[in-house]
């Protein structure tokens, strides 16, 4: 199933007014479990990062993580890169309107070919690597872009049901994915080969998180792919399921998982 057309429709709708865009960011932070895990990791890393850190949001998408970081960590200077020119233009206009343009800029870039515009203390890469075939090249680029002692944070599907694939005969739920997910050993090995000195990988989307994903993402996407008329029903659907999704997300966030359909990866470049 192609997910990009649905994302683009949602993006255009919520980009009509700054308040709608802020509401969209809030909903993404609540509904997407990966956002909970990423924000928790960033809060922890912020205690060791410089207060004036230079940050790369690699594959920024709608820009919700850059928005959260720019408001949470007032000293951080953020560069956001994305391959889609429309999203780059939208983010730059929105951040300037919100008077954050001095600490944020979005640029159009293909991560496979782009080599950066400077050195970063933190590189954030959420829901990106499953779309890139030449992942080793990108990992190597990230390493070369980073300052010593910097961190790379990745959120990506695992090979244990990520992309909703549970057997060799199944196809990814998201048509744009070039791989169903990474194993812990696989992504660790690639990052070590790229030069990173320490790599930590933990499972996300355990049982409760997988249920939350189905309620918050899978079922709505299936409905919207069937007919755009379901956009009308979407607010009522989310009002009904949101309390359950929040509870499931909190549960997933606060327990460790022996296995899960997602991975949270933190790699450190040696000092």
Question: Where are these predicted regions, by residue range?
Answer:
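Short conserved loop adjoining the S-adenosyl-L-methionine
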Residues: 113-117
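S-adenosyl-L-methionine-dependent methyltransferase catalytic module, highlighting the catalytic core
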Residues: 2-41, 64, 83-87, 94, ...
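Conserved beta-strand/loop positions that form the S-adenosyl-L-methionine
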Residues: 58
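Glycine-rich helix-loop-beta junction characteristic of Rossmann-like nucleotide cofactor-binding loops
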Residues: 42-50
């Amino acid at each position: 199933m192609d997910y990009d057309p649905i994302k683009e429709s949602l993006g255009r709708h919520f980009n009509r007014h700054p308040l709608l865009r802020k509401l969209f960011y809030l909903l993404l932070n609540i509904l997407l479990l990966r956002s909970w895990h990423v924000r928790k990791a960033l809060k922890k890393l912020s205690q060791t990062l410089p207060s004036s850190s230079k940050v790369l949001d690699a594959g920024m998408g709608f820009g919700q993580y850059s928005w959260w970081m720019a408001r949470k960590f007032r000293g951080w200077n953020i560069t956001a890169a994305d391959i889609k020119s429309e999203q780059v233009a939208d983010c730059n206009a929105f951040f300037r309107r919100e008077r954050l343009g001095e600490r944020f800029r979005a640029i159009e870039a293909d991560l496979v070919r782009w080599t950066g515009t400077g050195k970063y203390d933190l590189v954030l890469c959420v829901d990106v690597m499953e779309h890139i075939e030449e992942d080793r090249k990108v990992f190597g680029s990230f390493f070369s872009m980073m300052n010593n002692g910097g961190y790379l944070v990745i959120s990506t599907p695992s090979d244990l049901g990520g992309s909703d694939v549970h057997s060799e005969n199944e196809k990814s739920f998201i048509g744009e994915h070039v791989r169903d997910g990474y194993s812990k050993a696989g992504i660790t090995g690639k990052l070590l080969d790229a030069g990173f000195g320490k790599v930590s990988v933990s499972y996300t989307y355990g049982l409760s998180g997988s249920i939350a994903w189905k309620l918050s993402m899978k079922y709505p996407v299936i409905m919207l792919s069937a007919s755009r008329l379901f956009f009308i029903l979407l607010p009522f659907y989310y009002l009904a399921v949101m309390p359950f999704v929040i509870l499931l997300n909190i549960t997933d966030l606060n327990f460790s998982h022996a296995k899960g359909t997602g991975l949270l990866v933190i790699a450190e470049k040696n000092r």
